[in-house]
């Protein structure tokens, strides 16, 4: 009987010293992390339309109990719903020509409170530029009967136009970086 008392006392003391949980946050599954990243983008990006998950690439080892940094990669697409409507994402269909964003998120669980840093940038712009360049080359071939100086003049302005357009697009299409803390 006396041995049972000391064993029980030892177990109670071990729990009191160690605590019931050594994690500073509740476990976060991969699906919850992706949902949190999408809702963070919708809430902090300043976009008029809501974005919904298009694809998520699960990492080989997502540990919901980890205190170290965790990375996730996802693709989101613009929907027909506006942010101001405050509708559920399940009710929102994708826009046919909606913007597609490639996002990388980093969860820093070692911080108190935990931190999410989300970086998103537009996808698919290179295809549009290549299509425009092909159309311009076709126009140039059709205009081969023009005098030489007209051709040079047009070629110069086409290069100038491409350069200006490229710089403007690069300036306005910088990746969006969002950093937030979230309580658990």
From Swiss-Prot:
Gene3D superfamilies according to UniProt: 3.10.450.10
Gene Ontology biological-process entries: defense response to bacterium; killing of cells of another organism
UniProt cross-references to Pfam families, sorted A to Z: Cathelicidins
SUPFAM superfamilies named in the record: Cystatin/monellin
Source organism, top-level taxon: Eukaryota
Subcellular localization(s) per the UniProt record: Secreted; Target cell membrane
Entry comment describing in which tissues the protein is expressed: Expressed by the venom gland.
Gene Ontology, cellular component aspect: extracellular space; membrane; other organism cell membrane
Keyword Signal: yes
PANTHER family: CATHELICIDIN, NEUTROPHILIC GRANULE PROTEIN
Record's miscellaneous remark: The putative mature sequence has been predicted by AMPA, a predictive algorithm for identification of peptide stretches with antimicrobial properties.
Summary of the function given for this chain in its UniProt record: Potent antimicrobial peptide against Gram-negative (MIC=2 ug/ml against E.coli ATCC 25922, MIC=8 ug/ml against P.aeruginosa) and Gram-positive bacteria (MIC=32 ug/ml against E.faecalis, MIC=32 ug/ml against S.aureus). Adopts an amphipathic alpha helical conformation, that may allow to partition into the target membrane. High hemolytic activities have been observed on mammalian cells.
Protein name: Cathelicidin-related peptide Pt_CRAMP1
